Amino acid sequence: MVVTRGDKFAGSSLACKSMIGANKMSGSHLHEVNNSRSHFPQTNWLKVAKAFECIPSLNKFMGSNFLYSLESQKLGRDREMAARSIENIAPVTVQTLARPQIEKAWCTLINLSINNTYLRPGITPAIDNDSTSRTSSTKGSTFKVTSNADGSFCAHNHPEHSQRSVRGTAKSIDSFSSSSVGDNKIIIDKVPRVNYEVRDSVTVTNGMEMPPIKNSAQLARPVEPREVSLGEIDYDDIMEIIDVDQIAMEHCPSTCTKQPSVSKFVDIFTSRREEEQGLPPEICSNCSHGIKLGLCPEASTHVEQMKDTLLAISNEILDNTYDLGPDHVEQLHQKRLLLKKQIQQLEILIHNKERKKSQCLVSIPSHNTQYETPQTTNLEVVYGQTDSPTHVKEQGRCVTDNWNMPRDYLVSKERYDISSGSEEREQSVSEVIDVTDTESSNDKKWTSSDFPWTKNLEVYNKLVFGNHSFRPNQREIINATMSGCDVFVLMPTGGGKSLTYQLPALLCAGITLVISPLVSLIQDQIMNLLQTNISAASLSAGMEWAEQLEILQELSSEKSKYKLLYVTPEKVAKSESLLRHLEILNSRSLLARFVIDEAHCVSQWGHDFRPDYQGLGVLKQKFPNIPMLALTATATTSVKEDVVQALGLVNCVVFRQSFNRPNLWYSVVPKTNKCLEDIDKFIRENHFDECGIIYCLSRMDCEKVTEALRVFGHKAAFYHGSMDPGKRAFVQKQWSKDEINIICATVAFGMGINKPDVRFVIHHSLPKSIEGYHQECGRAGRDGQRSSCVLYYSYTDYIRVKHMISQGGLGQGQMKMGYNCKASSGRMLETNTENLLRMVSYCENEVDCRRFLQLVHLGEKFDSTNCKNTCDNCSSSKILIDKDVTVIARQLVALVKLTGERFSSAHIVEIYRGSLNQSVKRNRQDTLHLHGAGKHLTKSEASRILHYLVTEDILAEGVKKSELYGSVSSLLKVNRSKAASLLSGGQSITMRFPSTIKVSKQSKSTANPAKVPLKQTTLPMAKAAPQDSNLSGILLTALKNLRTDIVKESPDLVMAYHIFGNATLKEISKRLPRTKEELLDINGLGKAKVSKYGDRLLETIDSTINDHYKTRPGSGKRRRDENVNPNVAEDDDPDWSASQSHKKVVKNKK
């Protein structure tokens, strides 16, 4: 028996008394037991309790009479005779304790106070006034009492459970004998043993009733001493015999109501029919179990299978868009739409069931608390003066909390309803909607100049943003969103997505809410807007409460200075306060539009899935009439459709721009042991002292590459997620301000970077997907200049990345899916693995154009001839030939089977090519008939064929990590379902390989287009400036120095590209503007920047020209003052014209 000290012995005292009494019975009272067979035991309980409390010692208790309470405890004829013989047993002789500590421990067990107050069902015990002080008391002890075969007892001390004092009468035992010196066991010797049919052990813990012994007692002969435990008592045996309802009725007849003896049963068939009628039509079809989908208990499994089928259909549409017939494609689209509806309806149904189940579980009190009502504490918050601390009254006592509460808290709290912490909101379930989208990239409707805002659009674009024209699709997107349409935009990095919502924000009344994934990206956008005198604000979890309140107050004002509000998706998902303010703004017609930046994060099939993005569907649910603009630079067809569905864009207009970046040069280079030396050589020969990013797989790789580049003489630093946030921010600031050239980073770096002059992006290891690789490469050359994208590939990196994916190291965020978390994690792992295999296939391909491989994956048709030798495959001088490798593929699959599917791909290649290394000999694989069958192949050719079998899922590659060395290795296994067709002759494999014949090498400039300058188009000047290349170079250097000085004078978050872009400085150095009016003709210089920095620019230009031509100083300034127009460009300013018109009207009225 295990007894735990605690405050809840009232419920278990009766069972405990019955058990102790059953150990020693008097045969003289058996006839009384038989006569009381028809009575209920509630009266006996009172007698037993009273007798138990009056016992002064154990000896008297063991010899006392006991009244049976249970039917099963009454003895039969044979057992009755055995029980009577107990009376003839001699009194027990108890020896004196040898150790006072053990005696003290045993007395502590016996002296436990027991509350014998009986409570009728539904009534909780009263709580003492001083229970608060006893709530968090010291740790107590647990004693385990076991009986030995010789009749002795053992008690073990376990100081684990908390203790509380309970009122009651104390019991004690006089003396005991110790088993051994220093042992914590207490042995009571020479006690005759009564053997019972009992089970394992009995435990009494805080707040739990101890059930009685299950079977009747039996007398047994003493055996050799061995430690056994008292049996566990079956609680069901008591409940089968005792009529609890009748006992409760007799104890409290005035407060209880008798229940009818006949139960009311529900017609389950009627209930099932009603449930079937309420099902949506999409899930009324029968599943594989022969049950309707909406009623099947395995609905979650069906959802997982449907999503797998949906992914397969999407891939089929994507991979075979140009090979399938239009009817087949339409059937696939219809099937995919039906699957989406079924999945969403089932997810809603399962979500509702899980919520009801959780509510039921919450409504049922736990076993430890259902018999006790905890003491509640009434809190009253008293607000005094705003500068004083907050006082909390808690039942008469005052608690002071040093909380710096802003002024006017009460007014602000009632008016704006803001809380200092994030408020969790129940995750909304998206409604099933029929989504239709219209491809409008070539729709002439949106290119029209008949819109009422066309003139202001062009004026603001020039004066505010300094743009003299729109980039492709910018005007069309702006016209569509300002017309009130929901718009989905697929535009490459550097295509000008930000202008499509910043310019409408200036022209439209109200606030534009922009949801952006990273705080760093938000800060970069706000700093850029501030340079153009556009007021914008942001709300994030890290901001001070008073600062958030101030921003929301300004947003709610009649004439708010803010036009754009930036928030993170987490803020929208978790802040009820923000939604309430949006509702207020919408009621006053001050909510203009929603903008979802990096919209591919919404989709689970996207390469950068963010769970909080899926909660953005609530915006369209709450504000259906507010237009939404979704922007992304990387999205496949399936991702686009998933995003549109998740955001609720019912009838959206889609603008798709080519993802081709003609200024980027792509190449894949074999990764060798001298990879770092190769990187140093590439940078020195092509981009020395220029800005670049090197992406690495792990933190260790980042630091190792950085250290090597520093040794080689480059200004480099590393950036990864394990760094201190302040250190990361400092490194990013150094790189953005050109204090360092190269940053070695993990994939956590880059999304919030808008640096235009990144000349190269190098991948030191394998990216996890083609979408991610395309986006990371897109961070190079945003200014339109030639830039390089180099990937160093090794199949070993594939093993490393796959292991990290399987361990969750490269996951896209933790799934918050509730009921189907495991299923979602499995699907996410499968999606990540498939994306990784596509990336391996991209790297292994030495034939096809790199642009073609990327763009076809993104759902865009691209003609390889338009590459113009800007990738390594197109610029290669190799002649390629097709080879049938079906026989080789069959041999490799058979070899994997022969070796027991226990070896890596590299080992299989060694065997196939006839290697006799120690590993092959040790495993006796040199005797296999396929050993050396591929000796005519080079190692790279055999490896490439084997890797192709892996990417085609004919061979599956498992990954394991060595616990001893920490290295990662792979094991090849045969996918028998996919390999059957190959082995049976139903499938053939043809691959391209380089021929041994080579053509003449092309010129160096063509082979390495990174060094070829991109032709720049410039607008003609009103007065042509003399062409002087030396002067242009000197002036460009002077202008960059001026920009550096301005950045040093500006706040920390202001970067060089916020002031002037490199393209803008180059245009100035070539065109040599001499007045502010001429500066406004430079692309990238708006009215605000000319007003801020115009004088300093012109002074720099004049001084440089004077120094170059040795002319008289000051002549330029006089010419500038003579040519300046005091009303320059103000006639085209709508705000200025409106103010002048207003003044004229007022003057006329006077």
From Swiss-Prot:
Helicase ATP-binding domain location: 478-653
Domain (Helicase C-terminal) ranges: 678-823
Gene: RECQL4B
Gene Ontology molecular function terms on file: 3'-5' DNA helicase activity; ATP binding; ATP hydrolysis activity; DNA binding; metal ion binding
GO biological process, one term: cellular response to cold
Species per Swiss-Prot/TrEMBL record: Arabidopsis thaliana (Mouse-ear cress)
Boundaries of every HRDC domain copy: 1029-1111
Cellular localisation: Nucleus
Matching SMART domains: DEXDc, HELICc, RQC
Tissues in which the protein is found: Mostly expressed in roots, seedlings, shoots, shoot apical mersitem, flowers, and siliques.
GO cellular component, one term: nucleus
Family: Belongs to the helicase family. RecQ subfamily.
Chief location: nucleus
NCBIfam families, sorted: recQ_fam
Alphabetical list of PROSITE patterns matching this protein: DEAH_ATP_HELICASE, HELICASE_ATP_BIND_1, HELICASE_CTER, HRDC
Expression triggers: Repressed by cold.
InterPro entries linked: DEAD/DEAH_box_helicase_dom (IPR011545), DNA/RNA_helicase_DEAH_CS (IPR002464), DNA_helicase_ATP-dep_RecQ (IPR004589), Helicase_ATP-bd (IPR014001), Helicase_C-like (IPR001650), HRDC-like_sf (IPR010997), HRDC_dom (IPR002121), HRDC_dom_sf (IPR044876)
Entry-linked Gene3D superfamilies: HRDC domain, P-loop containing nucleotide triphosphate hydrolases, Winged helix-like DNA-binding domain superfamily/Winged helix DNA-binding domain
Coiled coil (UniProt feature): 327-361
Protein name: ATP-dependent DNA helicase Q-like 4B
Compositionally biased spans, kind Low complexity: 132-142
Region annotation Disordered: where it falls in the sequence: 124-143, 154-179, 416-446, 1106-1150
EC nos: 5.6.2.4
Lineage: Eukaryota, Viridiplantae, Streptophyta, Embryophyta, Tracheophyta
